[in-house]
C-alpha cells in the first residue's frame, strides 16, 4: 500500500520494520517483555562517560517539582556536539524519560550524527532510580474527565488521574524554556513521543493543543483508558496546522495493546500504569481485573488503525499507522524509539512515513 498519507494512512507491516531482524528480535523477546518491568532500576545509559555516544552527544540533567509538589521530575538532555543549524536543532521530547533514556543506544545516536540532522533529545521522567513512577504517570499522562469530582484511573481507582493538561502546561511553560536556555531549538521541528499511557498523552496533546508540537509519535497508546475516552475527545479535535504529522505504532495484539481477549489482562497494578497486564496471580483484586477486562472490551482491536485512518482525513495532518508483527506491548517501548528518532531528525520526511 502506498506510503503517501495526505488522505489515507500508510499501513506498513512488520516485514518493513528495519528488515526481518527486528521482527525476529521482537518475537524472541516477547515472552520476557510482555510488558515493561515497572520495578526495574534504570541502570547504565548512553549518558555514562564511558559510552561511545559521548563522541556524538553531550548530556546533562536537572530536576523540578510539579506545581502541587506531589511529583518531582528529572529531565535528561542530550545535545549533539556539532554546531547547531542556522534555525536551531530539531528536538524530540520523550515521556517516561527514565525508561526512554535507558532504551536509547549509542549506535542510534552515532548513526544520527553520521547520517542526518541529529535532534536534541529531552527525556522527561521522574526523580527515582526506577524506570517508571506508576502513580505519577497515571496522573500526568491521562486526560481530565468531564463532570464533578476528581478523575481517577481506570484500573486502580485509588490513583488520581486526569492531569494531562497540567503536565502539558509544565512542558510548555517550564521545560521547553529551560531547554531553549541551554541549546538552540528550531520551534518548527518539535516532536513528542510516548508509549502506552505516554502514547495516550501524545494523542490528547494532538487533539487538544496540536500547535504544541509538529510531530506526534504514539507507541501502543492506551486507547482503552476510561472505556475509550480519547475517542470522545477525537470528536472535538482542534484544528491542526499544515505539516503536522502523526505516527502510531502498534504491537502484535490485533494492531494495538487493547485486545480484550489478550491473556495478559488480569494484573491491575500493571493495568493502572497503562500496560497490558501479565497472567493472573494469586492475590489479584478480581474487581480491578474485571474493570480492566470491561475497559478493553469497550475498544475494538482495530481501534488504532481506524483512528489513524480518520486522522488522515483531517486538513493539515499526515497520519501513518505501522504494525510491528510479533512485538508485545512492553517490547514496543524499545522498538519505537528508533522510528521516533527518525521522525524527529527529519529522516522520515514531513509525513512521518518510515523507510
Over which residues does each language-model region extend?
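The feature captures the conserved acid-bearing segment of alpha/beta-hydrolase catalytic domains
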Residues: 220-320
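Alpha/beta-hydrolase fold nucleophile elbow
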Residues: 184-195
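Conserved hydrolase catalytic core segment
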Residues: 204-214
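Histidine-bearing beta->alpha loop at or near hydrolase active sites
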Residues: 324-330
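Gly/Ala-rich beta-loop-alpha elbow adjacent to hydrolase catalytic centers
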Residues: 194-198, 202
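Residue in the alpha/beta-hydrolase core beta-strand immediately N-terminal to the catalytic nucleophile
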Residues: 191, 215-217
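Serine-hydrolase catalytic machinery in alpha/beta-hydrolase-like enzymes
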Residues: 87-170, 174-182
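A domain-start/cap signature at the N-terminus of enzymes
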Residues: 34-89
Amino acid at each position: 500500500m502506498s506510503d503517501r498519507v495526505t488522505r489515507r494512512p500508510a499501513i506498513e507491516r512488520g516485514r518493513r520494520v528495519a528488515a526481518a531482524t527486528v521482527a525476529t528480535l521482537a518475537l524472541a523477546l516477547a515472552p520476557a517483555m510482555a510488558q515493561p518491568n515497572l520495578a526495574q532500576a534504570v541502570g547504565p545509559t548512553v549518558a555514562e562517560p564511558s559510552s561511545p555516544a559521548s563522541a556524538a552527544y553531550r548530556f546533562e540533567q536537572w530536576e523540578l517539582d510539579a506545581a502541587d509538589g506531589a511529583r518531582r521530575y528529572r529531565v535528561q538532555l542530550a545535545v549533539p556536539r556539532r554546531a547547531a543549524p542556522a534555525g536551531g536543532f530539531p528536538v524530540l521530547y520523550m515521556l517516561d524519560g527514565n525508561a526512554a533514556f535507558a532504551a536509547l543506544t549509542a549506535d542510534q545516536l552515532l548513526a544520527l550524527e553520521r547520517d542526518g540532522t541529529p535532534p536534541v533529545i529531552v527525556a522527561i521522567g521522574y526523580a527515582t532510580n526506577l524506570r517508571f513512577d506508576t502513580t505519577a504517570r497515571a496522573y500526568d499522562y491521562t486526560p481530565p474527565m468531564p463532570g464533578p469530582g476528581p478523575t481517577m484511573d481506570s484500573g486502580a481507582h485509588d490513583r488520581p488521574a486526569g492531569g494531562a493538561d497540567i503536565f502539558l502546561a509544565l512542558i510548555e511553560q517550564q521545560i521547553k524554556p529551560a531547554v531553549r536556555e541551554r541549546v538552540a531549538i528550531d520551534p518548527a521541528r518539535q516532536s513528542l513521543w510516548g508509549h502506552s499511557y505516554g502514547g495516550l498523552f501524545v494523542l490528547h496533546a494532538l487533539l487538544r493543543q496540536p500547535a504544541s508540537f509538529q510531530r506526534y509519535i504514539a507507541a501502543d497508546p492506551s486507547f482503552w483508558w476510561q472505556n475509550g475516552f480519547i475517542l470522545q475527545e477525537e470528536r472535538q479535535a482542534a484544528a491542526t496546522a499544515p505539516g503536522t504529522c502523526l505516527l502510531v505504532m502498534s504491537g502484535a495484539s490485533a494492531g494495538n495493546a487493547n485486545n480484550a481477549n489478550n491473556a495478559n489482562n488480569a494484573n491491575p497494578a500493571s493495568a493502572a500504569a497503562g500496560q497490558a497486564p501479565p497472567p493472573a496471580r494469586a492475590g489479584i483484586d478480581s474487581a480491578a481485573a474485571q474493570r480492566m477486562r470491561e475497559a478493553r472490551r469497550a475498544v475494538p482491536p482495530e481501534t488504532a488503525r481506524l483512528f489513524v485512518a480518520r486522522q488522515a482525513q483531517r486538513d493539515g495532518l499526515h497520519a501513518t499507522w505501522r504494525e510491528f508483527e510479533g512485538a508485545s506491548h512492553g517490547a514496543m517501548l524499545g522498538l519505537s524509539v528508533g522510528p521516533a528518532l527518525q521522525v524527529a531528525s527529519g529522516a522520515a520526511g514531513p509525513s512521518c512515513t518510515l523507510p
